[in-house]
């Protein structure tokens, strides 16, 4: 089952629990707008290259739509649609006043020069500038994009609409970005882990962890969990996987990787089969890489007692059912990795106010939002007698449904 089908299935289950009628369900599921544009740019060698860009704006009942823009060769409308819908529920669960959107361009960033990426970003912005905006749709970085990409979007958008720093988040600090934004998703994963373990009278300190993915989310999650006393016994990325039952020295590993080293030549651990990473012995498994990595092929072999979904849709539907039967507690992506969108909201607020927060305030407010969201999910689980994933979906869908009905959009 692909991400769109799984997200839609979770939505329908939540809608049934809430007793939403079919007309309202249809209204909530169908995107507000799907945009597909052709972006042709001159390459450095003088030839022309054409790329296809997408933006799906799913729902704006609770506020401006919010979601990343990814540059990846496999960007397709179904995936973008699923991720836009997921953002609608994620922002609602986090209690930030946004709806959901997602976008992307089908390209391979590594095959384009910096100047080609800039031209592509500016052309894409020219095509969609009248459909995004501070109070309409606020993009952010995603796979294959970064703060520099957001700076180009901001600059190009401002040519049409005047200086508008709040039109994108995840910007460089010098252009209105927020302190703490770079670490926000990984920090949110750590706060979510803390909340879950506390609920089960456990703590990060003394627990063992396996982390898949050492990109922005995984590396920050690993660093912060390590700082809290968590013992990370195995990690993996696209180059392979390593383990050390006594615990990996995460600061040393991250320094090693920043200097160009690979996992396999890191001195502080032994190489392991990457296929075994997700079923390695641990208390807490934290997948922070791609979707669908936990499936019917490996779910039955998972030894972790808790799974924290740092990635989007890392657990497919069949794996979810297998893990539930095993008694594994899964903290769903729409809550666990929402730290990024929460701090994006803080950045947007700071831009609108023209007042910058210090990093301590950003982190303090993020912790408060993550704790409150977990409590709200728990309350929903209790009232609906459901697991954490369905509790989170039901919480998000309920908030969006209420906003839709209050606006009179149900017809």
Swiss-Prot record:
What keywords are assigned to this protein?
Answer: Mitochondrion, NAD, NADP, Oxidoreductase, Transit peptide
Main location class: mitochondrion
Q: What triggers or suppresses the expression of this protein?
A: Induced in shoots and roots after nitrogen (N-deprivation) and phosphorus (P-deprivation) deprivations. Induced by alkali stress. Up-regulated by salt stress in old leaves.
Location comes to: Mitochondrion
Q: Record's InterPro entries?
A: Aminoacid_DH-like_N_sf, Glu/Leu/Phe/Val/Trp_DH, Glu/Leu/Phe/Val/Trp_DH_C, Glu/Leu/Phe/Val/Trp_DH_dimer, Glu/Leu/Phe/Val_DH_AS, Glu_DH, NAD(P)-bd_dom_sf, NAD_bind_Glu_DH
Which residue positions are annotated as catalytic? 102
> One cellular component GO annotation, for this chain's record?
mitochondrion
| Catalytic activity reported | L-glutamate + NAD(+) + H2O = 2-oxoglutarate + NH4(+) + NADH + H(+); L-glutamate + NADP(+) + H2O = 2-oxoglutarate + NH4(+) + NADPH + H(+)
The terms under GO molecular function for this entry are: glutamate dehydrogenase (NAD+) activity; glutamate dehydrogenase (NADP+) activity
The protein's enzyme class: oxidoreductase
| Transit peptide per record | 1-18
Q: What tissues express this gene product?
A: Barely expressed in leaves, spikelets and roots. Glumes and stamens specific accumulation.
- An annotated GO BP: glutamate catabolic process
Q: What is its EC number?
A: 1.4.1.3
Q: Please report which protein family the annotation says this sequence is part of.
A: Belongs to the Glu/Leu/Phe/Val dehydrogenases family.
Q: What is this protein called?
A: Glutamate dehydrogenase 3, mitochondrial
- Organism phylogeny: Eukaryota, Viridiplantae, Streptophyta, Embryophyta, Tracheophyta
């Amino acid at each position: 089952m692909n991400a769109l089908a799984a997200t839609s299935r979770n939505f329908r289950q939540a809608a049934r629990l809430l007793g939403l009628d079919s007309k309202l369900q249809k209204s909530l599921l169908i995107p507000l707008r799907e945009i597909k544009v052709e972006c042709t740019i001159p390459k450095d060698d003088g030839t022309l290259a054409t790329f296809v860009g997408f933006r799906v704006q799913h729902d704006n009942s609770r506020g401006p739509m919010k979601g990343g823009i990814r540059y990846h060769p496999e960007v397709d409308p179904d995936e973008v649609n699923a991720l836009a819908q997921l953002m609608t529920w994620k922002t609602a669960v986090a209690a930030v006043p946004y709806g959901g959107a997602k976008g992307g361009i089908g390209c391979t960033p590594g095959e384009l020069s910096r100047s080609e990426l800039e031209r592509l970003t500016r052309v894409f912005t020219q095509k969609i500038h009248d459909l995004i905006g501070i109070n309409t749709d606020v993009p952010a970085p995603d796979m294959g994009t970064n703060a520099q990409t957001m700076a180009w979007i901001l600059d190009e958008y401002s040519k049409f609409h005047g200086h508008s720093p709040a039109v994108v988040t995840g910007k460089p600090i010098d252009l209105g970005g927020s302190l703490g934004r770079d670490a926000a998703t990984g920090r949110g994963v750590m706060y979510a882990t803390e909340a879950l373990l506390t609920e089960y009278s456990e703590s990060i300190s003394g627990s063992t962890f396996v982390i898949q993915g050492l990109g922005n989310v995984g590396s920050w999650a690993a660093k912060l969990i390590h700082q809290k006393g968590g013992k990370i016994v195995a990690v993996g990325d696209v180059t392979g996987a390593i383990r050390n039952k006594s615990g990996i020295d995460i600061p040393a590993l991250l320094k090693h990787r920043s200097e160009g080293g690979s996992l396999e030549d890191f001195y502080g651990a032994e190489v392991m089969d990457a296929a075994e990473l997700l079923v390695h012995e641990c208390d807490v498994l934290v997948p922070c890489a791609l979707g669908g990595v936990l499936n019917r092929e490996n779910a039955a072999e998972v030894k972790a007692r808790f799974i924290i979904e740092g990635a989007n849709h890392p657990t497919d539907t069949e794996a979810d059912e297998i893990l539930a039967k095993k008694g594994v507690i899964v903290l769903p992506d729409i809550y666990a990795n929402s730290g990024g969108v929460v701090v994006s909201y803080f950045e947007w607020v700071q831009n609108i106010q023209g007042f910058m927060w210090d990093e301590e305030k950003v982190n303090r407010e993020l912790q408060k939002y993550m704790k409150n969201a977990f409590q709200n999910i728990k309350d929903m689980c209790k009232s609906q007698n459901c697991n954490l994933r369905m509790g989170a979906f039901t919480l998000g869908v309920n908030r969006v449904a209420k906003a839709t009905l209050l606006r009179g959009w149900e017809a």
